[in-house]
């Protein structure tokens, strides 16, 4: 049974109903409809913390989806799961892959910056200030890209860039 039929959350049910109506009226191929169903089920599982199920759905959606823009969001969500699981190297890989298909994903740049900043903090705790600075510099570059795409967002990152004199 598709996940959309078993979800008890009102907002998810509403989204599923609207998505199903749109799938019926918008001209799409059966493959595109099936890919979207897997994507939607992946989002639902992810929102409930069922990451293994979400990944299965996302991988199936990736197998079926041909549109690069749509694939970018699937890859981004896979990156989110790996981030949540502390698998930062894998997460970065998926964010990069998402950005290759859609370079206008500020949230991917932000998440990459957060991971780099975290790694910089880890390097400081390990007493390696040179490595920490390299990670912080990389975080700064990603945050600048995110802010360029969405001016006015990422205020905390903007403040960090100013405080650390990384803002140009």
From Swiss-Prot:
Principal cellular location given in the protein's record: plastid
One Gene Ontology term from the biological process aspect of the record: photosynthesis
This protein's record includes keyword NADP: no
Membrane topology designation: Peripheral membrane protein
Intervals holding TPR repeats: 35-68, 72-105, 120-153
Subcellular location: Plastid, Chloroplast thylakoid membrane
GO cellular component, one term: chloroplast thylakoid membrane
PROSITE patterns per UniProt: TPR (PS50005), TPR_REGION (PS50293)
Keyword Membrane belongs to the record: yes
Keywords, alphabetical: Chloroplast, Membrane, Photosynthesis, Plastid, Repeat, Thylakoid, TPR repeat
Transmembrane segments: none
Role according to the record: Essential for the assembly of the photosystem I (PSI) complex. May act as a chaperone-like factor to guide the assembly of the PSI subunits.
Sequence similarity: Belongs to the Ycf3 family.
Alphabetical list of HAMAP family matching this protein: Ycf3
Annotated PANTHER family: CELLULOSE SYNTHASE OPERON PROTEIN C (PTHR44943), TPR REPEAT-CONTAINING PROTEIN MJ0263 (PTHR44943:SF8)
Protein name: Photosystem I assembly protein Ycf3
């Amino acid at each position: 049974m598709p996940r959309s039929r078993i979800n008890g959350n009102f907002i998810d049910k509403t989204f599923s109903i609207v998505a199903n109506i749109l799938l019926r009226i918008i001209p799409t191929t059966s493959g595109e409809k099936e890919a979207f169903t897997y994507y939607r089920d992946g989002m639902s599982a992810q929102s409930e913390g069922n990451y293994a199920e979400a990944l299965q759905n996302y991988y199936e959606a990736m197998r079926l989806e041909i549109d690069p823009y749509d694939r970018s969001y699937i890859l981004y969500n896979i990156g989110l799961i790996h981030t949540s699981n502390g698998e930062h190297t894998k997460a970065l890989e998926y964010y990069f892959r998402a950005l290759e298909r859609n370079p206008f994903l500020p949230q991917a740049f932000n998440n990459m910056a957060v991971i780099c900043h975290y790694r910089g903090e880890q390097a400081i705790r390990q007493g390696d200030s040179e490595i920490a600075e390299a990670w912080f510099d990389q975080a700064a570059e990603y945050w600048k890209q995110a802010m360029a795409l969405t001016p006015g967002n990422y205020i905390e990152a903007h403040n960090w860039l100013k405080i650390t004199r990384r803002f140009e």
